[in-house]
Amino acid sequence: MAPYRIVFIRHGESVYNEENRFCGWHDADLSGQGITEAKQAGQLLRQNHFTFDIAYTSVLKRAIKTLNFVLDELDLNWIPVTKTWRLNERMYGALQGLNKSETAAKHGEEQVKIWRRAYDIPPPPVDISDPRFPGNEPKYALLDSSCIPRTECLKDTVQRVLPFWFDTISASIKRREQVLIVAHGNSLRALIKYLDNTSDSDIVELNIPTGIPLVYELDANLKPTKHYYLADEATVAAAIARVANQGKKK
């Protein structure tokens, strides 16, 4: 076995996922299917004899609740949990709340794919007077206004997430703590891009399914030696296809 191991889980399906809407920093709840996925993720971890010493998640309820369901299945409700805005989903700007298929019909699938997946092209920003601007929410009241995005591309998300990896998560791993991260499609893509040294162009094609644990085994320098999902290939492929198809016209 590799010296270190970390487990990533994208939150279970949210109400906005179910409705095929851009979610971002909007605090959407889990759907019924999302609750089932979260519980199943915990069951998969238990069946494969995983345990954890510490967990990290975002400040968005779909990730927090997923983590809670997972820990409940593992009987690990007592372990320390750190919630941070740095693990939040990418902020989708003026796209937040819009239906992805309707947006693709209006602007074209290729433009929506660029907005969803391009590394360095953000969607149009929200105005600070817009109710969708996170700075209007109490949970960010103590956060410096310069840190609160009006929109983000994946490059921005990487720059937000990686300091938390270097300052906090990697230190936990090196202390030989068993670490669980429950976050979002794009904050996890940011971490995986760094770990796998994925190019800016290749990251466009990476899709992470909801609710399936992703295990990374790391060497002494925290470089990946192996990674795998705790599910069979057909299940993972079908789940990834569902994510990839979200930005297409119906």
Swiss-Prot record:
What is the tissue specificity? Ubiquitously expressed with the highest expression in the sub-tegumental muscle layer (at protein level). Expressed in the tegument (at protein level).
Q: Where in the cell is it found?
A: Tegument
* Documented EC number(s): 5.4.2.11
InterPro entries registered for this protein in UniProt: His_Pase_superF_clade-1, His_PPase_superfam, Phosphogly_mut1
The name on file for this protein is 2,3-bisphosphoglycerate-dependent phosphoglycerate mutase
Q: Where is this site: Transition state stabilizer?
A: 184
Activity regulation here?
A: Strongly activated by 2,3-bisphosphoglycerate (2,3-BPG). Inhibited by vanadate in a dose-dependent manner.
The residues responsible for catalysis, as annotated, are 11 (tele-phosphohistidine intermediate), 89 (proton donor/acceptor)
Enzymatic class: isomerase
What would you give as a GO molecular function for this chain, any one? Answer: phosphoglycerate mutase activity
Provide the family line: Belongs to the phosphoglycerate mutase family. BPG-dependent PGAM subfamily.
Q: SMART domains attached here? A: PGAM (SM00855)
The record's catalysed reaction(s) read: (2R)-2-phosphoglycerate = (2R)-3-phosphoglycerate
Q: Name one Pfam family in it.
A: His_Phos_1
Deletion consequences? RNAi-mediated knockdown results in significantly decreased enzyme activity on the outer surface of the worm. No effect on motility, morphology or viability during culturing for 7 days.
Chief localisation class:
other
Q: Where does (2R)-3-phosphoglycerate bind?
A: 24, 89, 92, 100, 116-117, 186
